[in-house]
């Protein structure tokens, strides 16, 4: 099949909004990764240092402008207006810093440039600034990409089976309980995952992203975990010096609250990319890499798609070709959608509606009852 070729798929690739929760195919697809790659224009795989830096520098300039306005003009506002200005700053700065987080994440995928040392340098600097242990998460995230959709080996947001639901689960299965759980997840989910592997796959031993001897890592990776920790400590020391000079309240308002927004968006984005009523999970008897990579969903965050460098609405392509730079992912997605057909899942439900729906509908997974594939698991919510 030549570039731009098409392979038959079970049904049309276009879905109505009422079809978004219909189960995607779980059979082995009639196409290969090679077929998908041939359909993508070759230039989409090329990484440009000037272009990559242009997005990073643009985000830095915007974040710096927000910081400058907040530090120089908010104190001049009458009190009622300052109560409006600070939440606006937190929301806007948190969104822009999430964009910087995404670019540092691309560095971990070697999608920023053709030079691994440059990618790692940029990624270490900017992930450390956002209190992310760069190399530590780079390696665990790489394993997530290698095992997406596997109930045994995926790294994060591994769904539970019904037997693993705690006794109090049924008491939280109501609107108030869901809102409470979502709030805890968005506020504490990211630091708890990094520190204690909460929502991650089980390991023998202390699975902590800051611990070089954690079972997450092999011997070749441990030295770089120390580098990640050094980056975090350096930023923490800088924050301490800033707080000592300018006050803790200033540090919290200018940096701490926007960082909470970043962490919340990170958890939300990841949660909605991998949690959806239509998506299967697989045990070892059924899982393979391609079907696992396709067990993801693209979402629509409106204008935030651009602010987040399209990590939200091109996630399927990202899982298939993770070294592709974000600025080519939209074109690549359009190229592969006709081949993917029903294997491609897009849900345009507003994120604030989708997060509640998924919290309600996707409580645990159970084996497929409608077919003969006992190694395929689907979400359910009947406790």
Curated annotation (Swiss-Prot):
Pathway: Lipid metabolism; polyunsaturated fatty acid biosynthesis. Its EC number is 1.14.19.22, 1.14.19.6. It is found in: Endoplasmic reticulum membrane; Microsome membrane. GO terms for molecular function: acyl-CoA (9+3)-desaturase activity; acyl-lipid omega-6 desaturase (cytochrome b5) activity; omega-6 fatty acid desaturase activity. It is a multi-pass membrane protein. Disruption phenotype: Enhancement of both microviscosity and lipid/protein ratio of mitochondrial membranes, which in turn were responsible for the change in lateral mobility of lipids and for bioenergetic parameter modifications. Increased membrane rigidity and cold sensitivity. Hypersensitivity to salt or osmotic stress. GO terms for cellular component: endoplasmic reticulum membrane. Its main location: endoplasmic reticulum. Changing residue 335 to T: In sve1; Altered fatty acid composition and suppresses the low temperature-induced phenotype of tocopherol-deficient mutant. ER (microsomal) omega-6 fatty acid desaturase introduces the second double bond in the biosynthesis of 18:3 fatty acids, important constituents of plant membranes. Delta(12)-desaturase with regioselectivity determined by the double bond (delta(9) position) and carboxyl group of the substrate. Can use both 16:1 and 18:1 fatty acids as substrates. It is thought to use cytochrome b5 as an electron donor and to act on fatty acids esterified to phosphatidylcholine (PC) and, possibly, other phospholipids. Very low constitutive hydroxylation activity. This is Delta(12)-fatty-acid desaturase. It comes from Arabidopsis thaliana. The lineage of its organism: Eukaryota, Viridiplantae, Streptophyta, Embryophyta, Tracheophyta.
